[in-house]
Amino acid sequence: MQTPSKGKLFLVVGPSGSGKGTAIVQLKKRHPDYVFPVSCTTRAPRLGEKEGEVYSYISKEQFRAWIEEGRFLEWAEVHKDNYYGILKAPIEEALAAGKVVIREVDIQGYKKVISTLPREDVVGIFILVKDLEELKKRILKRGFIPEDEMARRMESAQKEISQMDVCNYQIESPFGHIEKVVQSIEDIIQKETA
């Protein structure tokens, strides 16, 4: 695909279990020329996670200092325990270099980003699973989740779905058809960067 003269940031949004993470993994394999910025977090690495692949692990003190310095494009404190955020500089540099930048965010993160960057630089793609029972099954396939956590995720999914129209595009994610989701994202990128 052709690189645009000025880059674009494609934010992939959707509830837990929608397939957005799996789609991004596939896009990374298929498009090594795209930029996939990592998030910073204060949580400890989980088993199998490596520094710099999905997250950069930093201390709460460092994270708070970077908030004060205005280094984050968007950030959030999750469960009053850990911070997560996306640094501005790598994204701004990639956009200035004409790169396609892809990042997964939640709906609140998307809203923060579109209030910060020029709107024409950002494209929102919402990955939708219409059936919440299907969504629940997908989440449970990953492993056991306590009932209260599942209830929280389902409530969050309903809230995100109710706000999906703030994104430029909505893609349906049928079970077992991640290739269709990836192809739809590629088609959107092609259209938006032509």
Residue ranges and their predicted role:
Residues T3-P4, L140, F144-I145, K159-A194:
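NTP-dependent small-molecule kinase module
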Residues V13-P15:
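P-loop (Walker A) phosphate-binding loop of NTP-binding proteins
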Residues S18:
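ATP-binding Walker
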Residues G21:
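Walker A/P-loop
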Residues K29-P37:
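Post-Walker A helix-loop "phosphate-sensing" segment adjacent to the P-loop in P-loop NTPases
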Residues T41-V101, I107:
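ATP-dependent small-molecule kinase phosphotransfer cores
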Residues V101-I107, L117-K141:
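Conserved phosphate-donor/acceptor-positioning beta-strand/loop module used by diverse small-molecule
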